């Protein structure tokens, strides 16, 4: 590569140098250079022993989002390689990614393809979004593929119209029996009954919007939708040291 680079004209070399300097500018920071100088995480071990790895970045500053993208890319590549070449295609310890603020973090290239092949390797993700509009903005053409590759869909509430419509359609329709009675008065009074079956959305988009905040809707592949109370997180006992770390 260096030989190819050096074969260019002086103007081309200067342009490459400027582009490279701009790309690597953040690595001039001593703290970032120190963080990325050596590998201390042993990423493949996540698929071999129980481990919790937290990646915390400020939600109001995207300057270092690329680090999380690098971390995700390295994790998926190394875990897939470990599963395929050491354990016959499936990791001994399941690895679950909780991808909070999914829309605000840089993602690996071809994430939709990664999502479609991870299950057999004992890798899974929870994609957490404010609404489906965020997913459509990130993956204009592949968003339906991403939703389709998720076996579970949990709706906690929201105020975005396209999400309400999607959830309403996902719920499907209910069958309604309708009885209509008619009676005419007079000399030859008649009495009639009309019976018909019709369909109605289980919840209309407006009813989805007005869903009681205590409830959530859960969709599991191959099962009927479930409406249930959300779990009260205040019931979980958190020890004082853990509370302080949070």
Show the residue positions of the predicted features.
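P-loop NTPase motor domains
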Residues: 1-123, 138, 206-227, 236-239, ...
């Amino acid at each position: 590569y260096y030989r190819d680079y050096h074969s260019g004209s002086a103007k081309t070399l200067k342009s490459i140098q400027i582009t490279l300097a701009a790309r690597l500018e953040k690595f001039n920071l001593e703290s970032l250079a120190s963080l990325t100088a050596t590998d201390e995480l042993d990423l493949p071990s996540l698929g071999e022993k129980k481990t919790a790895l937290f990646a915390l970045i400020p939600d109001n500053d995207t300057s270092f989002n690329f680090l999380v993208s690098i971390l995700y890319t390295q994790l998926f590549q190394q875990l897939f390689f470990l599963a395929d070449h050491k354990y016959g295609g499936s990791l001994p310890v399941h690895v679950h990614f909780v991808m909070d603020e999914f829309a605000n973090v840089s993602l690996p290239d071809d994430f939709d393809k990664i999502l479609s092949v991870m299950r057999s390797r004992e890798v899974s993700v929870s994609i957490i979004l404010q609404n489906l509009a965020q997913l459509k903005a990130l993956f204009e053409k592949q968003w339906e593929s991403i939703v389709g590759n998720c076996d579970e869909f949990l709706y906690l509430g929201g105020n975005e119209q396209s999400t309400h419509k999607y959830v309403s359609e996902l719920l499907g329709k209910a069958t309604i029996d309708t009885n209509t009675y008619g009676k005419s008065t007079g000399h030859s009074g008649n009495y009639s009954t009309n019976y018909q079956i019709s369909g109605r959305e289980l919840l209309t988009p407006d009813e989805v919007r007005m869903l009681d905040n205590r409830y959530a809707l859960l969709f599991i592949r191959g099962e009927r939708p479930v409406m249930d109370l959300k779990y009260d997180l205040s019931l979980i006992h958190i020890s004082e040291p853990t509370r302080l770390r949070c």
